[in-house]
């Protein structure tokens, strides 16, 4: 007599074609509430779609490879006998009961967590599914022997390397014995405490406060929901919220698993269930907010407002520096504000790796000095950076992945060679670009660099003179240092950093000879470039500087 209902894809954000990568059920299967039906995979996360209630699968409407979106029918489910009793009082309106399965599982999750609670027998409360962790320390124990607790009360707090979570009691009762202490390491299935169950009274007691129509435990909830679901939920949540400290929201193991599969830190999600419990709908709403670019304001207001933002960092400390002495406050220049934000974004978003090497520039430096002597009257001063720009062009031709940019799933390989160089100015760092460096000689590049550097110092660079770069060079040659990690100038995928050259004794087979050595620091984007390719690029670049005739090859 149970009526088959449609189980549909819940709210998964703004995705309208998410592929099904796994189907977990087939016709005839008996499933429980929260059992996974299918697994979906977006470009950002893999998630299981759970069943909102127990029953028997009558028909599966999708297969692996199908694309689904919110509202797509997944399976036809014949509800189990227990929930089937609910439609009787609401026979006049079966549609609302089927149309709103999502709110129902949230309250049902608590009774489902304590099926083994008999009348007043003892039960073992164990660590639920906490993912792949096998040794999570207990940092707080909230109960002691003799305490009377309610369902969803926190019993212990665990802390992994990524999050802190409370483990809630699956039901109410009296704590007979606590099996763990602060500092113990626990894993899924570890016994936390022995509870003398009040299942027959605790869970129904909470339910009985709201509905009056029937004495059976879960069935009465849908009856008032048919008339006014929102008002029914509000009174239940209000007293619960009043009794909660608000320090940590709780979530059932199934909801924690659901959140984990979506890549959501459950501690950031605000709970709307009883006692601040986090429901699946809360997690889905959080994900929808993040994917729509709203940064899930309700969920993250506290964390972001504390100064940690999305990275979950500690709040930035506030200091009154005047307590320690005299200070002066200066506003950041516009260039520093803009470049600082860009550098921070690039450092956080790009997986940087830096290879350090060195190049023998003894002969090249002698050649540079000779050129400067020859061009003394023309006023052109050749710098080592001009040679490095020409060497960079040759290296980019040999290793085209370095002359590229990421565009979603595509790699854009550039056929032009525009090389940027970092210029230090009184107002901050800028990167002028030498356009078509492959078509210019060292003297022309030196002249153009001098002109661009002057414009940069005077604050007169035009936007197009800082755009279109393929690769950048950051030179500290005139200042000092040995090696450093330059930050990639996105959307480029690599940057070369150079420091001050120094004399180094090198064994030539017969004796040690002084050689002028230039430190090289190549930072590269690991999404595009592999370590071996980066090492070859650095080696080849050094060979070009050591013997500039190789440029002609």
UniProtKB/Swiss-Prot annotation:
Record flagged with keyword Transport: no
Keyword set includes Acyltransferase: yes
Domain Lipoyl-binding as annotated: residue spans: 4-78, 122-196
Record EC number: 2.3.1.12
Modified-residue entries (N6-lipoyllysine), positions: 44, 162
Residues of the active site: 526
Peripheral subunit-binding (PSBD) domain span: 250-287
Cofactor binding description: Binds 2 lipoyl cofactors covalently.
Disordered: region residues: 97-118
The organism's place on the tree of life at top rank: Bacteria
Catalytic activity: N(6)-[(R)-dihydrolipoyl]-L-lysyl-[protein] + acetyl-CoA = N(6)-[(R)-S(8)-acetyldihydrolipoyl]-L-lysyl-[protein] + CoA
Gene3D superfamilies: 2.40.50.100, Chloramphenicol acetyltransferase-like domain, E3-binding domain
GO MF: dihydrolipoyllysine-residue acetyltransferase activity; lipoic acid binding
Keywords: Acyltransferase, Lipoyl, Repeat, Transferase
Cofactor(s), names only, from the UniProt record: (R)-lipoate
Pfam families assigned to the protein according to its UniProt record, in alphabetical order: 2-oxoacid_dh, Biotin_lipoyl, E3_binding
Family in the record: Belongs to the 2-oxoacid dehydrogenase family.
PANTHER family referenced in this protein's UniProt entry, alphabetically: DIHYDROLIPOAMIDE ACETYLTRANSFERASE COMPONENT OF PYRUVATE DEHYDROGENASE COMPLEX, DIHYDROLIPOYLLYSINE-RESIDUE ACETYLTRANSFERASE COMPONENT OF PYRUVATE DEHYDROGENASE COMPLEX
Name by which UniProt lists this protein: Dihydrolipoyllysine-residue acetyltransferase component of pyruvate dehydrogenase complex
The gene coding this protein: pdhB
